């Protein structure tokens, strides 16, 4: 449902932007910044679950042809609460950074509405992990993660330089958890990431 709603919004905005169609071409840069929401899947682990989080997202795209770009995703750290499975007591919190490098294909570089798809590689690092409640005083560690990422999105030009951006991406994040040095197994945080941003072309 979220993807359908996003696509409907993009279609409506594309009609509104049709009078300001601006091309992008080889050698152009796009810089975007805006609201980014990270939404882990519900069944992360048999014992614990990871809540959603939001932060400032940044991304940088370079057009090495008129259609193909390399994008680097960055962000201010996301902070997640970790609860007992089923939405129970908060037992920990952690921060993470999910830098992602993707190759994107932009379908209509000469139009104001520029949809694209992309695929790439994600590296996620966890830090500032704290414990509470039933786990207070214990040492919880979450290992770093490598995984694949895929995305869909669109840029909507508002003039020669300024643009709006909407995107949804899926990131494969899986961390190994340890409590006081003992393994708790893998925590699958495979997540949807939604972004609404403003950007500039140069």
Model region roles, listed by residue range:
Residues 1-27:
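Cleavable N-terminal export/targeting peptides
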Residues 79-84, 93-95, 159-202:
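Predominantly the C-terminal beta-signal and adjacent terminal strand-loop region
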Residues 42-48, 81-89, 127-136, 176-183:
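Outer-membrane beta-barrel translocator domains and adjoining extracellular loop/strand segments
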Residues 25-39, 191:
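Transmembrane beta-strand segments of Gram-negative outer membrane beta-barrel proteins
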Residues 31-37, 72-76, 117-123, 154, ...:
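Transmembrane beta-barrel strands of outer-membrane/channel proteins
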Residues 116, 126-172:
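A charged, solvent-exposed segment within the mature domains of Sec-exported extracytoplasmic proteins
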Residues 25-28, 59-133, 145, 194-202:
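Gram-negative (and chloroplast) outer-membrane scaffold detector with strong preference
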């Amino acid at each position: 449902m979220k993807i359908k709603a996003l696509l409907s919004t993009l279609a409506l905005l594309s009609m509104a932007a049709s009078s300001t169609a601006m091309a992008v071409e080889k050698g152009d840069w796009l810089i975007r910044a805006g609201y980014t929401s990270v939404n882990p899947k519900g069944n992360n682990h048999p014992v614990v679950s990871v809540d959603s989080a939001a932060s400032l997202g940044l991304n940088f795209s370079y057009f090495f042809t008129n259609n193909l770009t390399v994008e680097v995703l960055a962000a201010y750290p996301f902070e997640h609460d970790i609860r007992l499975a089923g939405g129970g007591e908060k037992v920990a919190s952690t921060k993470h950074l999910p830098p992602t490098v993707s190759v994107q294909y932009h379908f209509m570089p000469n139009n104001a509405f520029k949809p694209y798809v992309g695929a790439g590689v994600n590296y996620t690092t966890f830090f500032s992990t704290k414990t509470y409640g039933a786990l207070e005083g214990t040492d919880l560690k979450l290992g770093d993660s490598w995984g694949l990422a895929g995305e869909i999105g669109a840029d909507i030009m508002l003039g020669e330089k300024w643009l709006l951006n909407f995107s949804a991406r899926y990131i494969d994040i899986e961390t190994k958890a340890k409590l006081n040095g003992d393994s708790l197994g893998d925590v699958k945080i495979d997540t949807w990431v939604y972004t609404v941003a403003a950007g500039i072309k140069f």
